[in-house]
Regions:
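Substrate-binding pocket helix/loop in short-chain dehydrogenase/reductase
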Residues: 22-23, 30-35
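C-terminal helical subdomain
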Residues: 124-216
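Conserved amphipathic alpha-helix within the SDR
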Residues: 1-6
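Residue(s) in the substrate-gating loop at a strand-loop-helix junction
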Residues: 66
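Active-site-adjacent segment of SDR/Rossmann-fold oxidoreductases
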Residues: 53, 71, 87, 92-102, ...
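Active-site loop-to-helix junction immediately N-terminal to the catalytic Tyr of the SDR YXXXK motif
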Residues: 26, 72-80, 92, 120
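Active-site helix of classical SDR
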Residues: 46, 82
Length: 219
């Protein structure tokens, strides 16, 4: 591809299919095919462009998730799993690409397409022009784009979606029981303390710091 078209600095990976069925009726082939097109297909595209972006110290990648993967939707276990996988892929590529000025983001589009035309009434579809997604994608591909951002877009609405973790609590070993979790669940699940973590180690460091504070251990 690069031999024919030259350097590729911008990539939007958006290929997809549907094989909707309830989980009880879904065949292994239905699950595997959707993951192959959505998740593996995105991997192949990113992999093909990655080293060139690293060599040039510049790249912008947008992968495509879905509200089905972020929030769930009946009959789309395969599609939801594939689209949720995009978030993990984005998180790692954004971390690895940071030093080479490669910014990786995710778009969660809601638009009138062949995949949605049978799911919504005509008056709703009329509001959901695919063109309403374009500004968000172009922003995420821009020189001043953020990185590791999930942006929702549809019908002229734009929002940022985050995976967050509550502050939680640290329990003494005597309380490492399901009963103690139940007793403290309101505090554990208190979303007023929720934060978006920057990477996997930040979570590990938080848990270790909480445990050290309880034990009086200086790290």
């Amino acid at each position: 591809m690069t031999k024919e078209w030259g350097a590729v600095d911008l990539l939007c990976a958006n290929a997809g299919i549907l094989r909707d069925k309830s989980f009880a009726k879904m065949e292994v082939a239905d699950f595997a095919k959707v993951l192959d097109v959505h998740l593996n297909g995105t991997f192949y595209c990113c992999k093909a462009m990655w080293n060139g972006m690293r060599e040039r110290n510049y790249g912008r990648i947008v992968v495509t998730t879905s509200s089905s993967g972020l929030f769930g939707n009946f009959g789309q276990a395969n599609y939801g799993a594939a689209k949720a996988g995009m978030i993990g892929l984005m998180n790692v590529l954004a971390e690895e690409g940071r030093k080479n000025n490669i910014r990786v983001n995710t778009i969660s589009p809601t638009a009138a397409t062949r995949m949605t035309e049978e799911l919504l009434p005509p008056q709703a579809l009329a509001l959901m022009k695919p063109e309403s997604i374009t500004p968000a994608v172009l922003y995420l591909l821009g020189e001043d784009a953020p990185t590791r951002t999930i942006m929702g877009a549809g019908a002229g609405s734009f929002a940022v979606i985050k995976v967050v973790e509550t502050e939680g609590i640290n329990l003494p070993s005597v309380d490492w029981t399901p009963e103690a979790i139940a007793a403290h669940f309101a505090e554990i699940s208190d979303m007023s303390t929720a934060k978006a973590l920057e990477n996997a180690f930040q979570q590990t460091n938080k848990y270790v710091s909480q445990a050290a504070a309880r034990a009086g251990v200086k790290l």
